[in-house]
Amino acid sequence: MSDWSDLQKDKWINENREVEEVDAWDASSEDEVEKVEEEIKEPPKPVVKQLTKKQALQRAIELKEKELKEPQGDFDIYLEEKRKKELQEASDLENSKNLFSGLSVKESSSGEPISTFIPKTEKDFEQYSQIVSDYLLKYDSSIHYATFFKSLMKKVLVNVSSSDMNDISKTLTVLINEKLKNEKSGKGGNKTKTKVAPKKIHMGNELQNYDDFDDDDFM
């Protein structure tokens, strides 16, 4: 009877051992599956840190300095000159906008600001020219006034026909002749001052009178 109990006990132990081995194998299989799934998972994408305005500006400056240090060919020099010219034209345009921006405070006869006033008729353009000229005449004492008008004429007459430009040229010629006539007659703004001849000092008579004195006159 004891042998039978021992046999049953050994059988029960072996069955438990087999169950434990099966459970351990299943657990190991699940761990391996999870490990494989983790490996095939896509790695997380790196987070792109957004630059601040200051950092972006600094980065742009560094790239520009690096570009300037590199040797330039003829084509690069041409592009650089073209870029400078475009920047200058943009600067001139901005200056013109700033110059005429003050006109918005003045109103036309219709009561609307001059910046929104769109002249259509000849009378409208006459009124518009008067307002613009009144504004520009505030700067006629500047030494850059004539240079400003040369630059202004090149820009505002770019789309004017040759015949109209010829009429404008005739108007300028009339103004020049009137200005010359006024300057010659002394009525112009720049009057020619008459030069006063320096006074001559006549020492001849004084020296002659001095020679007429005799040494005895001082005795």
Curated annotation (Swiss-Prot):
<dbReference type="GO" id="GO:0003743">
    <property type="term" value="F:translation initiation factor activity"/>
</dbReference>
<dbReference type="GO" id="GO:0033290">
    <property type="term" value="C:eukaryotic 48S preinitiation complex"/>
</dbReference>
<dbReference type="GO" id="GO:0005852">
    <property type="term" value="C:eukaryotic translation initiation factor 3 complex"/>
</dbReference>
<dbReference type="GO" id="GO:0001732">
    <property type="term" value="P:formation of cytoplasmic translation initiation complex"/>
</dbReference>
<comment type="function">
    <text>Component of the eukaryotic translation initiation factor 3 (eIF-3) complex, which is involved in protein synthesis of a specialized repertoire of mRNAs and, together with other initiation factors, stimulates binding of mRNA and methionyl-tRNAi to the 40S ribosome. The eIF-3 complex specifically targets and initiates translation of a subset of mRNAs involved in cell proliferation.</text>
</comment>
<keyword id="KW-0175">Coiled coil</keyword>
<feature type="region of interest" description="Disordered">
    <location>
        <begin position="22"/>
        <end position="47"/>
    </location>
</feature>
<dbReference type="Pfam" id="PF08597">
    <property type="entry name" value="eIF3_subunit"/>
</dbReference>
<keyword id="KW-0648">Protein biosynthesis</keyword>
<dbReference type="InterPro" id="IPR013906">
    <property type="entry name" value="eIF3j"/>
</dbReference>
<comment type="subunit">
    <text>Component of the eukaryotic translation initiation factor 3 (eIF-3) complex.</text>
</comment>
<protein>
    <recommendedName>
        <fullName>Eukaryotic translation initiation factor 3 subunit J</fullName>
    </recommendedName>
</protein>
<keyword id="KW-0396">Initiation factor</keyword>
<dbReference type="InterPro" id="IPR023194">
    <property type="entry name" value="eIF3-like_dom_sf"/>
</dbReference>
<comment type="similarity">
    <text>Belongs to the eIF-3 subunit J family.</text>
</comment>
<feature type="compositionally biased region" description="Acidic residues">
    <location>
        <begin position="22"/>
        <end position="40"/>
    </location>
</feature>
<dbReference type="GO" id="GO:0016282">
    <property type="term" value="C:eukaryotic 43S preinitiation complex"/>
</dbReference>
<feature type="coiled-coil region">
    <location>
        <begin position="48"/>
        <end position="100"/>
    </location>
</feature>
<keyword id="KW-0963">Cytoplasm</keyword>
